[in-house]
Amino acid sequence: MNDQSMTIRGKDRYKSGVMAYKKMGYWEPDYVPKDTDVIALFRVTPQDGVDPIEAAAAVAGESSTATWTVVWTDRLTAAEKYRAKCYRVDPVPNSPGQYFAYIAYDLDLFEPGSISNLTASIIGNVFGFKPLKGLRLEDMRLPVAYVKTFQGPATGIVVERERLDKFGRPLLGATVKPKLGLSGRNYGRVVYEALKGGLDFTKDDENINSQPFMHWRERFLYCMEAVNRAQAASGEVKGTYLNVTAATMEDMYERAEFAKELGSCIVMIDLVIGYTAIQSMAKWARKNDMILHLHRAGHSTYTRQKNHGVSFRVIAKWMRLAGVDHIHAGTVVGKLEGDPNTTRGYYDICREEFNPTKLEHGIFFDQNWASLNKMMPVASGGIHAGQMHQLLDLLGEDVVLQFGGGTIGHPMGIQAGAIANRVALEAMILARNEGRDYVAEGPEILAKAAATCTPLKSALEVWKDVTFNYESTDAPDFVPTAIAAV
């Protein structure tokens, strides 16, 4: 779009009154971002009649140093340095009235190692700006100098696998169902049967904390008894994600300490506790040698809509900085929102040391993670044993596959559900390691395994026709164009 700078220079720049943002220095098409700049990509939908350049410049201004009128105190600062600079505005393909705005922020605008401070600027005030119909933060480029101020995941994928002594396959889990209403004893029974049947983990759901039907301490005691018995019976390392989410940090620390005293290797928190609390728990987890699982409870309130909010790829980047070890990242084939290419982009952010620009996955910038540990993505929500070949193909092996209903809803019982999932996974991994086309042959591989495994046979019969084929609300805006061979 318009590549001419409109910035007013000299004393007229600070004349009292209202001035267009693009004339105040927030639109600089000649600006070349520095390696140390934080770069944000916004999807901007201006109100009818609002100039897209002015709208993008307003986003830059309101997320950095500007207010609605000129203030003379700007002259007391290094204003040229501290102003965010929108340097590029492009129409969004196939989305009339929407524009991608690229905005660069000087690193000195942000407190080191603070997600709360970063978000207070980038998404703090500007999303309610009246000249915009909608605003969405699509992606960010975080400079190495900034990334290095964060601790990153407390444990990381490599150490977690070493601790569990499980390699070469996805980990298996299940969320205890029903999520609310069970007594502590019955809750522990579910955990025991699922782990004994072959799962690696079970987990609390996002809203099980400490309610009248089951106090948190009671749940922790019964769950860890179940874990210990399942480990003794199977000879494998097992775990259960004990949700320590609570009303205050003091309560969360108390619950986490109790989980540690009982011998748990992992604790869980919800995204809704907030960025400061998440970072605090991540520091506790590293100090106490614990794995930290994050349930992304509440994320869809601002990640799902295409024209307003924050993309989950950005949330994933923030959480890798913050220091969680596990994060729910979508399933593609399950019941929850998840375009295949977009979801692959989320998984790339979790697991790669360097993310190259990959527009078909929604990744707009190269991202160097500066040796921060990798996060283990978690696939959960509406998946079952009959999809095992698809899950392995789409999500890879560094992932936790959580079959909640697909374990506990098994017609032969919880342990049988766990056996079905474990046998299906082992059969698919064997086929992959033998060099077979396990994606194309997946149904055949599962049918052969089911011939000698009644629980798997039953699972395939019950859920064979269950699919969740709905159009995604968040597909990438760019896809590769085929080039004819010459």
UniProtKB/Swiss-Prot annotation:
Protein's UniProt name: Ribulose bisphosphate carboxylase large chain
Taxonomic superkingdom: Bacteria
PANTHER family reported in the protein's UniProt record: RIBULOSE BISPHOSPHATE CARBOXYLASE, RIBULOSE BISPHOSPHATE CARBOXYLASE LARGE CHAIN
Cofactor requirements of the protein: Mg(2+)
N6-carboxylysine: modified positions: K203
Subunit field text: Heterohexadecamer of 8 large chains and 8 small chains.
Cofactor note: Binds 1 Mg(2+) ion per subunit.
UniProt site positions, description: Transition state stabilizer: K335
Protein family per UniProt: Belongs to the RuBisCO large chain family. Type I subfamily.
Active site: K177, H295
Note: The basic functional RuBisCO is composed of a large chain homodimer in a 'head-to-tail' conformation. In form I RuBisCO this homodimer is arranged in a barrel-like tetramer with the small subunits forming a tetrameric 'cap' on each end of the 'barrel'.
One biological process term in Gene Ontology: reductive pentose-phosphate cycle
Keywords (A to Z) from UniProt: Calvin cycle, Carbon dioxide fixation, Lyase, Magnesium, Metal-binding, Monooxygenase, Oxidoreductase, Plasmid
Chain sites annotated for binding substrate: N125, T175, K179, R296, H328, S380
Keyword Magnesium: yes
Binding-site list for Mg(2+): K203, D205, E206
Role according to the record: RuBisCO catalyzes two reactions: the carboxylation of D-ribulose 1,5-bisphosphate, the primary event in carbon dioxide fixation, as well as the oxidative fragmentation of the pentose substrate. Both reactions occur simultaneously and in competition at the same active site.
Enzyme's top EC category: lyase
Record's note on what induces expression: Expressed under CO(2) and H(2) autotrophic, but not under heterotrophic growth conditions.
Catalytic activity of the protein: 2 (2R)-3-phosphoglycerate + 2 H(+) = D-ribulose 1,5-bisphosphate + CO2 + H2O; D-ribulose 1,5-bisphosphate + O2 = 2-phosphoglycolate + (2R)-3-phosphoglycerate + 2 H(+)
One Gene Ontology molecular-function label: monooxygenase activity
Any matching Pfam family: RuBisCO_large
